Amino acid sequence: MNDFLLLLLVLFLGVPRSENHVINLEECFQEPEYENWLATASHGLTKTLNPKKIVIVGAGISGLTAAKLFREAGHEVVILEASDRVGGRIKTHREDGWYVDVGPMRVPQTHRIVREYIKKFNISLNPFRQTDENAWYLIKHVRQKMSANNPENFGYQLNPNERGKSASQLFDETLDKVTDDCTLQKEKYDSFSTKEYLIKEGKLSTGAVEMIGDFLNEEAGFHNSFLISVMDHFLFLNNSFDEITGGFDQLPERFFKDMDSIVHLNSTVEKIVHINNKVTVFYEGLSTNMRLVADYVLITATARATRLIKFVPPLSIPKTRALRSLIYASATKIILVCTDKFWEKDGIHGGRSITDLPSRVIYYPNHDFTNGIGVLLASYTWYSDSEFYTTLSDEKCVDVVMDDLVEIHNVSKDYLKSVCGKHVVQKWALDQYSMGAFSTYTPYQITHYSQMLAQNEGRIYFAGEYTAHPHGWIETSMKSAIREAINIHNA
Protein backbone atom coordinates (compact mmCIF):
# COMPACT_ATOMS: atom_id res chain seq x y z
CA MET A 1 0.00 0.00 0.00
CA ASN A 2 1.56 3.33 -0.99
CA ASP A 3 1.59 6.33 1.34
CA PHE A 4 -1.21 8.16 -0.46
CA LEU A 5 -3.63 5.28 -0.24
CA LEU A 6 -2.66 4.60 3.36
CA LEU A 7 -3.56 8.17 4.17
CA LEU A 8 -6.90 7.78 2.45
CA LEU A 9 -7.70 4.75 4.57
CA VAL A 10 -6.68 6.58 7.73
CA LEU A 11 -8.80 9.49 6.62
CA PHE A 12 -11.96 7.47 6.13
CA LEU A 13 -11.53 5.36 9.25
CA GLY A 14 -10.16 7.87 11.69
CA VAL A 15 -11.28 11.43 11.00
CA PRO A 16 -14.13 12.49 13.28
CA ARG A 17 -17.08 14.29 11.80
CA SER A 18 -17.20 17.97 12.69
CA GLU A 19 -20.34 19.68 13.86
CA ASN A 20 -20.75 21.41 10.51
CA HIS A 21 -19.74 18.34 8.50
CA VAL A 22 -16.86 20.31 7.02
CA ILE A 23 -13.54 18.48 7.19
CA ASN A 24 -10.36 19.81 5.71
CA LEU A 25 -9.53 16.67 3.77
CA GLU A 26 -6.88 18.45 1.74
CA GLU A 27 -4.47 18.26 4.67
CA CYS A 28 -5.26 14.57 5.11
CA PHE A 29 -4.24 13.93 1.51
CA GLN A 30 -0.81 15.44 2.02
CA GLU A 31 2.03 12.96 1.79
CA PRO A 32 4.04 12.17 4.95
CA GLU A 33 7.13 13.73 3.32
CA TYR A 34 5.41 17.05 2.64
CA GLU A 35 7.10 19.01 5.42
CA ASN A 36 10.48 17.72 4.27
CA TRP A 37 9.71 18.77 0.70
CA LEU A 38 8.66 22.21 1.93
CA ALA A 39 11.92 22.53 3.87
CA THR A 40 13.83 21.56 0.72
CA ALA A 41 11.97 24.22 -1.26
CA SER A 42 12.95 26.74 1.39
CA HIS A 43 16.57 25.74 2.07
CA GLY A 44 17.58 23.59 -0.90
CA LEU A 45 19.40 20.28 -1.03
CA THR A 46 22.62 19.75 0.88
CA LYS A 47 25.77 20.60 -1.08
CA THR A 48 26.96 17.53 -2.94
CA LEU A 49 30.45 16.07 -2.67
CA ASN A 50 29.77 13.92 -5.72
CA PRO A 51 28.42 16.10 -8.56
CA LYS A 52 26.19 14.26 -11.01
CA LYS A 53 25.43 15.01 -14.64
CA ILE A 54 21.66 15.26 -14.96
CA VAL A 55 19.50 15.80 -18.03
CA ILE A 56 15.96 17.05 -17.42
CA VAL A 57 13.35 16.53 -20.13
CA GLY A 58 10.87 19.40 -20.08
CA ALA A 59 11.09 23.03 -18.95
CA GLY A 60 7.68 23.17 -17.34
CA ILE A 61 7.46 24.16 -13.70
CA SER A 62 8.44 20.67 -12.55
CA GLY A 63 11.61 20.59 -14.63
CA LEU A 64 12.55 24.13 -13.64
CA THR A 65 12.03 23.41 -9.95
CA ALA A 66 14.23 20.32 -10.05
CA ALA A 67 16.92 22.11 -12.06
CA LYS A 68 17.14 24.93 -9.55
CA LEU A 69 17.60 22.47 -6.69
CA PHE A 70 20.22 20.46 -8.57
CA ARG A 71 22.26 23.51 -9.59
CA GLU A 72 22.28 25.02 -6.13
CA ALA A 73 23.47 21.67 -4.73
CA GLY A 74 26.39 21.59 -7.17
CA HIS A 75 25.19 19.17 -9.84
CA GLU A 76 25.66 19.69 -13.59
CA VAL A 77 22.26 20.13 -15.23
CA VAL A 78 20.86 20.55 -18.74
CA ILE A 79 17.15 21.01 -19.56
CA LEU A 80 15.82 19.96 -22.96
CA GLU A 81 12.53 21.61 -23.90
CA ALA A 82 10.65 20.77 -27.11
CA SER A 83 8.79 24.09 -27.39
CA ASP A 84 10.15 27.62 -27.81
CA ARG A 85 9.35 28.76 -24.27
CA VAL A 86 9.50 27.67 -20.64
CA GLY A 87 6.52 27.09 -18.35
CA GLY A 88 4.66 24.24 -20.02
CA ARG A 89 1.00 24.55 -19.13
CA ILE A 90 1.69 27.76 -17.22
CA LYS A 91 0.93 30.12 -20.07
CA THR A 92 -0.03 33.79 -20.15
CA HIS A 93 -1.32 35.46 -23.30
CA ARG A 94 -0.12 39.06 -23.45
CA GLU A 95 -1.09 42.01 -25.61
CA ASP A 96 -0.56 45.73 -25.21
CA GLY A 97 -2.38 46.84 -22.06
CA TRP A 98 -3.78 43.49 -20.95
CA TYR A 99 -3.04 39.82 -20.36
CA VAL A 100 -4.87 36.61 -19.49
CA ASP A 101 -3.74 33.33 -17.96
CA VAL A 102 -4.83 30.56 -20.31
CA GLY A 103 -3.33 27.90 -18.03
CA PRO A 104 -3.33 27.95 -14.21
CA MET A 105 -4.97 31.04 -12.75
CA ARG A 106 -5.13 30.55 -8.96
CA VAL A 107 -3.10 29.29 -6.01
CA PRO A 108 -4.87 27.75 -2.98
CA GLN A 109 -3.87 29.03 0.44
CA THR A 110 -2.89 25.50 1.48
CA HIS A 111 -0.37 25.08 -1.33
CA ARG A 112 2.66 26.12 0.68
CA ILE A 113 5.40 24.87 -1.65
CA VAL A 114 4.41 27.00 -4.63
CA ARG A 115 3.88 29.91 -2.25
CA GLU A 116 7.40 29.42 -0.91
CA TYR A 117 8.83 29.91 -4.39
CA ILE A 118 6.54 32.86 -5.06
CA LYS A 119 7.92 34.42 -1.88
CA LYS A 120 11.52 33.59 -2.85
CA PHE A 121 11.10 35.41 -6.15
CA ASN A 122 9.29 38.34 -4.52
CA ILE A 123 6.30 37.85 -6.82
CA SER A 124 3.14 39.69 -5.80
CA LEU A 125 -0.23 38.06 -5.21
CA ASN A 126 -3.74 39.43 -5.06
CA PRO A 127 -6.95 37.68 -3.98
CA PHE A 128 -8.75 35.44 -6.44
CA ARG A 129 -12.43 35.48 -5.56
CA GLN A 130 -14.00 32.12 -6.20
CA THR A 131 -17.55 33.34 -5.55
CA ASP A 132 -19.59 36.54 -5.72
CA GLU A 133 -23.14 36.62 -4.40
CA ASN A 134 -24.16 38.86 -7.30
CA ALA A 135 -23.12 36.29 -9.91
CA TRP A 136 -25.70 34.13 -11.61
CA TYR A 137 -27.02 30.62 -11.85
CA LEU A 138 -28.72 29.87 -15.15
CA ILE A 139 -29.77 26.24 -14.93
CA LYS A 140 -32.79 24.45 -16.37
CA HIS A 141 -33.91 27.76 -17.91
CA VAL A 142 -34.08 29.37 -14.45
CA ARG A 143 -31.98 32.48 -13.83
CA GLN A 144 -31.21 33.30 -10.21
CA LYS A 145 -28.68 35.32 -8.25
CA MET A 146 -26.32 33.19 -6.19
CA SER A 147 -27.31 35.23 -3.15
CA ALA A 148 -30.88 33.90 -3.41
CA ASN A 149 -29.68 30.49 -2.19
CA ASN A 150 -32.93 28.77 -3.12
CA PRO A 151 -32.19 25.53 -4.99
CA GLU A 152 -35.85 24.48 -4.92
CA ASN A 153 -36.58 27.07 -7.62
CA PHE A 154 -34.77 24.92 -10.17
CA GLY A 155 -37.29 22.08 -10.08
CA TYR A 156 -35.11 19.09 -9.29
CA GLN A 157 -37.09 16.01 -8.26
CA LEU A 158 -35.68 15.38 -4.78
CA ASN A 159 -36.45 13.04 -1.94
CA PRO A 160 -38.07 14.69 1.10
CA ASN A 161 -34.83 14.56 3.11
CA GLU A 162 -32.93 16.29 0.27
CA ARG A 163 -35.22 19.28 -0.15
CA GLY A 164 -34.00 22.71 0.91
CA LYS A 165 -30.35 21.67 0.75
CA SER A 166 -27.68 23.04 -1.56
CA ALA A 167 -25.66 20.84 -3.89
CA SER A 168 -22.65 21.24 -1.60
CA GLN A 169 -24.68 20.14 1.41
CA LEU A 170 -25.90 17.06 -0.42
CA PHE A 171 -22.37 16.14 -1.47
CA ASP A 172 -20.98 16.81 2.02
CA GLU A 173 -23.56 14.54 3.62
CA THR A 174 -22.49 11.62 1.45
CA LEU A 175 -18.94 12.14 2.74
CA ASP A 176 -20.14 12.31 6.34
CA LYS A 177 -21.77 8.94 5.80
CA VAL A 178 -18.46 7.48 4.64
CA THR A 179 -16.57 8.97 7.54
CA ASP A 180 -19.08 7.65 10.06
CA ASP A 181 -19.74 4.22 8.64
CA CYS A 182 -16.68 3.19 6.64
CA THR A 183 -14.99 -0.07 7.58
CA LEU A 184 -14.05 -1.01 4.05
CA GLN A 185 -10.68 -1.19 2.36
CA LYS A 186 -9.34 1.59 0.16
CA GLU A 187 -10.03 -0.37 -3.01
CA LYS A 188 -13.77 0.02 -2.58
CA TYR A 189 -13.65 3.80 -2.74
CA ASP A 190 -11.32 3.81 -5.72
CA SER A 191 -13.61 1.28 -7.40
CA PHE A 192 -16.51 3.75 -7.55
CA SER A 193 -16.98 6.42 -10.14
CA THR A 194 -18.29 9.61 -8.57
CA LYS A 195 -21.78 9.12 -9.97
CA GLU A 196 -21.87 5.49 -8.91
CA TYR A 197 -20.83 6.37 -5.37
CA LEU A 198 -23.43 9.12 -5.01
CA ILE A 199 -26.19 6.73 -6.09
CA LYS A 200 -25.13 3.45 -4.47
CA GLU A 201 -23.45 4.61 -1.27
CA GLY A 202 -24.74 8.15 -0.89
CA LYS A 203 -28.30 6.97 -1.59
CA LEU A 204 -29.05 10.19 -3.44
CA SER A 205 -31.98 10.56 -5.78
CA THR A 206 -31.48 11.09 -9.49
CA GLY A 207 -32.49 14.71 -9.01
CA ALA A 208 -29.89 15.25 -6.29
CA VAL A 209 -27.16 13.73 -8.46
CA GLU A 210 -28.21 15.98 -11.34
CA MET A 211 -28.14 18.97 -9.02
CA ILE A 212 -24.59 18.16 -7.89
CA GLY A 213 -23.55 17.71 -11.50
CA ASP A 214 -25.00 21.08 -12.52
CA PHE A 215 -24.22 23.32 -9.54
CA LEU A 216 -20.81 21.90 -8.61
CA ASN A 217 -19.83 21.36 -12.26
CA GLU A 218 -19.23 17.68 -11.49
CA GLU A 219 -21.28 16.24 -14.33
CA ALA A 220 -18.48 16.08 -16.90
CA GLY A 221 -16.27 14.39 -14.31
CA PHE A 222 -18.81 11.88 -13.01
CA HIS A 223 -16.76 9.11 -14.66
CA ASN A 224 -13.72 9.86 -12.48
CA SER A 225 -12.71 7.84 -9.46
CA PHE A 226 -14.79 9.04 -6.53
CA LEU A 227 -11.60 9.86 -4.63
CA ILE A 228 -10.64 12.44 -7.27
CA SER A 229 -13.94 14.22 -6.72
CA VAL A 230 -13.40 14.15 -2.96
CA MET A 231 -10.03 15.83 -3.29
CA ASP A 232 -11.32 18.46 -5.71
CA HIS A 233 -14.46 19.19 -3.74
CA PHE A 234 -12.76 19.83 -0.43
CA LEU A 235 -9.84 21.71 -1.92
CA PHE A 236 -12.28 24.27 -3.28
CA LEU A 237 -14.65 24.16 -0.32
CA ASN A 238 -12.12 24.94 2.39
CA ASN A 239 -9.67 27.21 0.65
CA SER A 240 -9.05 30.80 -0.18
CA PHE A 241 -7.19 31.53 -3.40
CA ASP A 242 -4.79 34.09 -4.81
CA GLU A 243 -3.58 34.93 -8.30
CA ILE A 244 -0.17 36.15 -9.38
CA THR A 245 -0.41 39.87 -9.97
CA GLY A 246 0.58 40.54 -13.54
CA GLY A 247 0.29 36.97 -14.83
CA PHE A 248 1.36 33.46 -13.89
CA ASP A 249 4.12 33.24 -16.49
CA GLN A 250 6.25 35.33 -14.14
CA LEU A 251 6.86 32.24 -12.01
CA PRO A 252 8.57 30.05 -14.66
CA GLU A 253 10.25 33.12 -16.13
CA ARG A 254 11.92 33.86 -12.81
CA PHE A 255 13.30 30.32 -12.69
CA PHE A 256 14.47 30.73 -16.30
CA LYS A 257 16.14 34.08 -15.62
CA ASP A 258 18.45 32.46 -13.07
CA MET A 259 19.51 29.57 -15.33
CA ASP A 260 18.78 30.42 -18.95
CA SER A 261 22.19 29.10 -20.02
CA ILE A 262 21.24 25.50 -19.19
CA VAL A 263 17.83 25.48 -20.90
CA HIS A 264 17.87 24.30 -24.52
CA LEU A 265 14.62 25.33 -26.22
CA ASN A 266 13.34 23.78 -29.45
CA SER A 267 15.03 20.54 -28.43
CA THR A 268 12.84 17.45 -28.81
CA VAL A 269 13.98 14.29 -27.05
CA GLU A 270 13.54 11.30 -29.34
CA LYS A 271 15.41 8.43 -27.70
CA ILE A 272 16.89 7.56 -24.31
CA VAL A 273 19.41 4.73 -24.02
CA HIS A 274 20.13 3.37 -20.54
CA ILE A 275 23.23 1.15 -20.39
CA ASN A 276 24.89 0.25 -17.10
CA ASN A 277 25.55 3.44 -15.13
CA LYS A 278 25.08 5.95 -17.96
CA VAL A 279 22.06 7.34 -19.80
CA THR A 280 22.36 8.81 -23.30
CA VAL A 281 19.71 11.24 -24.46
CA PHE A 282 19.25 11.75 -28.20
CA TYR A 283 17.41 14.90 -29.22
CA GLU A 284 16.62 16.99 -32.27
CA GLY A 285 17.50 20.68 -32.21
CA LEU A 286 16.52 23.35 -34.70
CA SER A 287 19.01 22.23 -37.31
CA THR A 288 20.75 19.09 -36.14
CA ASN A 289 20.48 15.91 -34.10
CA MET A 290 22.48 15.83 -30.91
CA ARG A 291 23.07 13.70 -27.83
CA LEU A 292 23.99 14.12 -24.19
CA VAL A 293 25.46 11.55 -21.82
CA ALA A 294 24.30 11.79 -18.22
CA ASP A 295 24.40 9.96 -14.93
CA TYR A 296 20.65 10.42 -14.46
CA VAL A 297 17.67 11.60 -16.47
CA LEU A 298 14.57 13.22 -14.99
CA ILE A 299 11.55 13.20 -17.30
CA THR A 300 9.05 15.94 -16.48
CA ALA A 301 7.07 15.84 -19.72
CA THR A 302 3.44 14.78 -19.53
CA ALA A 303 2.68 11.07 -19.58
CA ARG A 304 1.43 11.35 -23.14
CA ALA A 305 4.51 13.25 -24.31
CA THR A 306 6.70 10.67 -22.56
CA ARG A 307 5.16 7.95 -24.72
CA LEU A 308 6.67 9.66 -27.78
CA ILE A 309 10.18 8.90 -26.51
CA LYS A 310 11.83 5.63 -27.54
CA PHE A 311 13.48 3.92 -24.57
CA VAL A 312 16.33 1.44 -24.98
CA PRO A 313 15.85 -0.96 -23.32
CA PRO A 314 12.07 -0.45 -23.24
CA LEU A 315 10.40 0.69 -20.06
CA SER A 316 8.94 -2.09 -17.94
CA ILE A 317 5.55 -3.48 -18.91
CA PRO A 318 3.85 -2.13 -15.72
CA LYS A 319 5.30 1.35 -16.36
CA THR A 320 4.29 1.27 -20.01
CA ARG A 321 0.78 0.16 -19.12
CA ALA A 322 0.41 2.90 -16.50
CA LEU A 323 1.55 5.61 -18.92
CA ARG A 324 -0.74 4.27 -21.64
CA SER A 325 -3.78 3.92 -19.39
CA LEU A 326 -3.60 7.30 -17.69
CA ILE A 327 -6.47 9.59 -18.66
CA TYR A 328 -5.86 13.21 -19.66
CA ALA A 329 -8.65 15.71 -19.33
CA SER A 330 -9.44 18.20 -22.00
CA ALA A 331 -9.83 21.82 -20.88
CA THR A 332 -10.88 24.87 -22.87
CA LYS A 333 -10.78 28.55 -21.99
CA ILE A 334 -12.66 31.07 -24.11
CA ILE A 335 -11.76 34.65 -23.24
CA LEU A 336 -13.44 37.86 -24.35
CA VAL A 337 -11.63 41.20 -24.22
CA CYS A 338 -14.23 43.90 -23.58
CA THR A 339 -14.15 47.69 -23.57
CA ASP A 340 -17.22 47.76 -21.32
CA LYS A 341 -17.31 45.61 -18.17
CA PHE A 342 -21.01 44.85 -18.45
CA TRP A 343 -20.93 42.34 -15.58
CA GLU A 344 -20.14 45.13 -13.13
CA LYS A 345 -23.59 46.56 -13.83
CA ASP A 346 -24.85 43.45 -12.01
CA GLY A 347 -22.53 44.23 -9.09
CA ILE A 348 -20.15 41.40 -9.97
CA HIS A 349 -16.47 41.78 -9.10
CA GLY A 350 -14.68 38.45 -9.38
CA GLY A 351 -16.30 35.10 -8.71
CA ARG A 352 -18.14 33.01 -11.26
CA SER A 353 -21.52 32.32 -12.79
CA ILE A 354 -22.63 28.74 -13.40
CA THR A 355 -24.89 27.45 -16.16
CA ASP A 356 -25.91 24.23 -17.85
CA LEU A 357 -25.46 25.97 -21.20
CA PRO A 358 -22.24 25.17 -23.12
CA SER A 359 -20.25 27.90 -21.34
CA ARG A 360 -20.75 26.04 -18.02
CA VAL A 361 -18.61 28.38 -15.87
CA ILE A 362 -17.88 32.07 -16.43
CA TYR A 363 -15.11 33.66 -14.35
CA TYR A 364 -15.03 37.40 -13.81
CA PRO A 365 -11.72 39.27 -13.49
CA ASN A 366 -10.14 39.89 -10.11
CA HIS A 367 -7.91 42.70 -11.34
CA ASP A 368 -8.24 45.86 -13.40
CA PHE A 369 -6.17 47.30 -16.23
CA THR A 370 -5.32 50.99 -16.39
CA ASN A 371 -6.83 51.25 -19.87
CA GLY A 372 -10.23 50.15 -18.54
CA ILE A 373 -10.32 46.90 -20.51
CA GLY A 374 -12.11 43.97 -18.91
CA VAL A 375 -10.85 40.48 -19.70
CA LEU A 376 -13.65 37.97 -19.16
CA LEU A 377 -13.14 34.21 -18.97
CA ALA A 378 -16.44 33.66 -20.74
CA SER A 379 -16.20 29.87 -20.58
CA TYR A 380 -13.99 27.49 -18.64
CA THR A 381 -14.77 23.84 -19.31
CA TRP A 382 -13.12 20.47 -18.91
CA TYR A 383 -13.69 16.81 -19.78
CA SER A 384 -16.63 16.29 -22.14
CA ASP A 385 -17.82 19.89 -21.70
CA SER A 386 -14.48 20.99 -23.12
CA GLU A 387 -14.54 18.42 -25.91
CA PHE A 388 -17.73 20.06 -27.17
CA TYR A 389 -15.56 22.95 -28.38
CA THR A 390 -12.61 20.97 -29.73
CA THR A 391 -13.71 20.74 -33.37
CA LEU A 392 -15.28 24.21 -33.49
CA SER A 393 -13.44 27.18 -34.95
CA ASP A 394 -12.41 29.87 -32.49
CA GLU A 395 -14.99 32.18 -34.03
CA LYS A 396 -17.74 29.60 -33.50
CA CYS A 397 -16.63 29.10 -29.89
CA VAL A 398 -16.99 32.83 -29.32
CA ASP A 399 -20.40 32.83 -30.99
CA VAL A 400 -21.60 30.06 -28.66
CA VAL A 401 -20.45 31.76 -25.46
CA MET A 402 -21.90 35.10 -26.55
CA ASP A 403 -25.28 33.40 -26.98
CA ASP A 404 -24.95 32.15 -23.40
CA LEU A 405 -23.94 35.57 -22.06
CA VAL A 406 -27.03 37.08 -23.69
CA GLU A 407 -29.20 34.86 -21.49
CA ILE A 408 -27.08 35.07 -18.34
CA HIS A 409 -26.59 38.85 -18.30
CA ASN A 410 -29.69 39.94 -20.20
CA VAL A 411 -27.76 41.93 -22.80
CA SER A 412 -28.04 41.88 -26.58
CA LYS A 413 -25.66 39.96 -28.80
CA ASP A 414 -25.08 43.03 -30.95
CA TYR A 415 -23.97 44.89 -27.84
CA LEU A 416 -21.55 42.10 -26.90
CA LYS A 417 -20.08 42.08 -30.39
CA SER A 418 -19.57 45.83 -30.23
CA VAL A 419 -17.80 45.89 -26.85
CA CYS A 420 -16.00 42.52 -26.88
CA GLY A 421 -14.14 42.69 -30.16
CA LYS A 422 -11.14 40.54 -29.26
CA HIS A 423 -10.93 36.98 -28.05
CA VAL A 424 -8.47 34.27 -27.02
CA VAL A 425 -9.27 30.55 -27.19
CA GLN A 426 -7.06 27.92 -25.56
CA LYS A 427 -7.88 24.26 -26.23
CA TRP A 428 -5.42 22.21 -24.20
CA ALA A 429 -6.47 18.98 -25.90
CA LEU A 430 -4.88 20.36 -29.08
CA ASP A 431 -1.62 21.48 -27.50
CA GLN A 432 1.10 19.51 -29.28
CA TYR A 433 3.41 19.46 -26.26
CA SER A 434 1.14 18.66 -23.31
CA MET A 435 -1.44 16.73 -25.39
CA GLY A 436 -4.06 17.46 -22.75
CA ALA A 437 -4.79 19.72 -19.80
CA PHE A 438 -4.19 17.56 -16.73
CA SER A 439 -4.22 13.92 -15.73
CA THR A 440 -7.02 12.19 -13.90
CA TYR A 441 -8.04 8.73 -12.71
CA THR A 442 -11.03 6.59 -13.50
CA PRO A 443 -12.07 3.81 -11.06
CA TYR A 444 -9.30 1.43 -9.94
CA GLN A 445 -6.55 3.56 -11.46
CA ILE A 446 -5.36 5.09 -8.17
CA THR A 447 -4.95 1.59 -6.78
CA HIS A 448 -3.38 0.13 -9.91
CA TYR A 449 -1.24 2.94 -11.32
CA SER A 450 -0.46 5.81 -8.93
CA GLN A 451 2.60 4.19 -7.39
CA MET A 452 3.97 2.90 -10.70
CA LEU A 453 3.67 6.28 -12.41
CA ALA A 454 6.04 7.81 -9.85
CA GLN A 455 8.47 4.86 -9.85
CA ASN A 456 11.92 5.30 -11.40
CA GLU A 457 13.30 2.85 -13.95
CA GLY A 458 16.95 2.51 -13.08
CA ARG A 459 18.59 5.88 -13.63
CA ILE A 460 15.53 7.31 -15.36
CA TYR A 461 13.21 9.20 -13.00
CA PHE A 462 9.77 10.71 -13.53
CA ALA A 463 8.11 13.85 -12.17
CA GLY A 464 5.14 16.04 -13.08
CA GLU A 465 1.59 16.56 -11.89
CA TYR A 466 0.55 13.10 -13.09
CA THR A 467 3.00 11.45 -10.65
CA ALA A 468 1.51 13.01 -7.49
CA HIS A 469 -1.77 14.27 -6.02
CA PRO A 470 -3.98 16.19 -6.49
CA HIS A 471 -3.67 16.34 -10.26
CA GLY A 472 -3.74 19.58 -12.21
CA TRP A 473 -2.02 21.99 -9.81
CA ILE A 474 1.30 23.86 -9.93
CA GLU A 475 1.96 22.72 -6.37
CA THR A 476 1.70 19.08 -7.40
CA SER A 477 4.20 19.51 -10.21
CA MET A 478 6.62 21.23 -7.85
CA LYS A 479 6.40 18.71 -5.03
CA SER A 480 6.92 15.83 -7.47
CA ALA A 481 10.05 17.61 -8.73
CA ILE A 482 11.34 18.04 -5.19
CA ARG A 483 10.61 14.39 -4.44
CA GLU A 484 12.67 13.21 -7.40
CA ALA A 485 15.41 15.79 -6.87
CA ILE A 486 15.93 14.36 -3.39
CA ASN A 487 15.91 10.81 -4.76
CA ILE A 488 18.51 11.54 -7.45
CA HIS A 489 20.61 13.68 -5.11
CA ASN A 490 20.77 10.82 -2.61
CA ALA A 491 21.23 8.04 -5.19
Curated annotation (Swiss-Prot):
Q: How is it modified after translation?
A: N-glycosylated.
* Free-text tissue specificity from the UniProt record: Expressed by the venom gland.
InterPro entries the record matches:
Amino_oxidase, FAD/NAD-bd_sf, Flavin_amine_oxidase, Flavin_monoamine_oxidase
Q: Which PANTHER family match?
A: AMINE OXIDASE (PTHR10742:SF355), FLAVIN MONOAMINE OXIDASE (PTHR10742)
Sugar-modified residues: 122, 238, 266, 410
- GO cellular component annotations of the record: extracellular region
What residues bind FAD, as annotated? 61-62, 81-82, 89, 103-106, 269, 465, 472-477
Give a short account of what the protein does: Catalyzes an oxidative deamination of predominantly hydrophobic and aromatic L-amino acids, thus producing hydrogen peroxide that may contribute to the diverse toxic effects of this enzyme. Is very active against L-Lys, L-Phe, L-Leu, L-Tyr, L-Trp, L-Arg, and L-Met, moderately active against L-His, L-cystine, and L-Ile, and slightly active against L-Gln, L-Asn, L-Ala, and L-Val. L-Glu, L-Ser, L-Pro and Gly are oxidized very slowly. Its activity on platelet aggregation is controversial.
Temperature dependence per UniProt: Exhibits unusual thermal stability. At pH 7.4, the enzyme retains full activity after incubation at 25 degrees Celsius for 30 days. Is stable at alkaline condition and is not inactivated by freezing.
Coarse class of the protein's main subcellular location: secreted
Any idea which UniProt keywords this protein has?
Answer: Antibiotic, Antimicrobial, Apoptosis, Cytolysis, Disulfide bond, FAD, Flavoprotein, Glycoprotein, Hemolysis, Hemostasis impairing toxin, Oxidoreductase, Platelet aggregation inhibiting toxin, Secreted, Signal, Toxin
Similarity comment text for this entry? Belongs to the flavin monoamine oxidase family. FIG1 subfamily.
E.C. numbers: 1.4.3.2
Quick one: which residues bind substrate?
106, 380, 472-473
Q: Which cofactors?
A: FAD
- Catalytic activity reported: an L-alpha-amino acid + O2 + H2O = a 2-oxocarboxylate + H2O2 + NH4(+); L-leucine + O2 + H2O = 4-methyl-2-oxopentanoate + H2O2 + NH4(+); L-phenylalanine + O2 + H2O = 3-phenylpyruvate + H2O2 + NH4(+); L-tryptophan + O2 + H2O = indole-3-pyruvate + H2O2 + NH4(+)
What this protein is called in its record is L-amino-acid oxidase
Has the keyword Ribosomal protein been applied to this entry?
Answer: no
